[in-house]
Amino acid sequence: MMQTNLQLDLAFNYLENTGTNIFLTGKAGTGKTTFLKKLKETSPKRMIVVAPTGVAAINAGGVTIHSFFQLPFGPYIPGSEMASGQNKSYSHKFSRDKINIIRSMDLLVIDEVSMVRADLLDAISDMLRRYRDRNRSEERRVGKECRS
């Protein structure tokens, strides 16, 4: 039987009942992965789980950030031709299905967020702003930090 963790229960209830962001961190073995599994199994929210590496994505039951957002592996420079969609060598076009997934998503979980470069977070933010309803005040994100 799984032991109850009051802090994780509080975080779960907070996520379920608010639309605000949380940053979940903790040492190895504190229940972060169990929390994510419980969240995926029991939450009615439509969520996407991404991670910076293939191994982290598999462990979280998600996909890589680059795969989901169709990002190149080089650095992302806000305001650049790539960011504005003017770079002909990098045509950023999501399928209608992908756009619908992004627009209908209630929760974006970024597992192992401490491994994500700042420019990649900018790219994610820009993609969400571009494809989601612009009337929403914030994208809803959850980051689970990697600590060994």
Label each region the model flagged:
Residues 1-148:
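Conserved ATP-binding/catalytic motifs of P-loop helicase motor domains
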